[in-house]
Amino acid sequence: MVLYKDGKIYLKIVYWGMGASGKSTILKTLYRITKESKKDIIPIGELQIIEKASGATLYFDRGLFQSTKQKKVYYRVYTVAGQRGFTPLRKKIFDKTDDQTDAVIFVVDSRTNFLEDNVESLLELKNIANDRLLKEIPMIVMLNKQDLDDVIDEEDFKLILKDEKLWYEPENKLYIWNPLIYTSCALYDQKKDIYRSFHETARRAVLYHVYGEGKAPTEMDISQKTQ
């Protein structure tokens, strides 16, 4: 989070995932939704898209959005290039010293034949986040391309999250921050859960800072500060 003297707050949200999982398409669809419909979050300016002729992200995509209810709250939104050779750039975008990541949307290519590639991308994210996922950085999962055949379902991916210790059991105080898993389609004409997933991520990013001072707040933390 970056707080300026004029009271404006900038939160950074990163779409992360393997190459061709649909991150750029999601951002473009989110931009259209928030520009064309009355939503709690609106785009500011145009998207910055840096891509190859094939449409694959070359370095990153970036957009700026603003809360309509809390007008001094802004969201800097990035997508990262998912190809293996861009690991150093992904790390730089995620961990930029003066603008560190406040929340992550992990985008899964839901086709079952890409399961290992998705897990590899998740492991890289875990490593770069250095054990901060969920504890300090909220994460949402989008099982994208659900309009295709032979896709991963929610329970399959929940098992992966449990294996990677990115899922809390009910007795843990941070159970309320388990990643919500959305089954999505990024294509504008078939869009599903594009805005909902972003809105929830933005909500969690704010709650972590307001009630947890940059960490996952417990229900007691929230209760004490709302009394």
Spans of model-derived segments:
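Conserved beta-strand segments of the P-loop GTPase G domain that flank and frequently precede/overlap
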Residues: 77-79, 104-109, 141-144, 183-184
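Canonical P-loop GTPase G-domain recognition
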Residues: 149-213
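Switch II (G3) loop of P-loop NTPases
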Residues: 71-90
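Conserved nucleotide-binding/hydrolysis micro-motifs of P-loop NTPases
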Residues: 20, 83-84, 111-113, 145-149, ...
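Conserved C-terminal guanine-recognition region of P-loop GTPase G domains, centered on the G4
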Residues: 110-174
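Conserved G1/Walker A P-loop phosphate-binding module
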Residues: 1-50
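Conserved catalytic network of the ASCE P-loop NTPase/AAA+ motor domain
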Residues: 55-58, 66-71, 93-100, 131-135
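Inter-motif core of Ras-like GTPase G domains
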Residues: 87-113
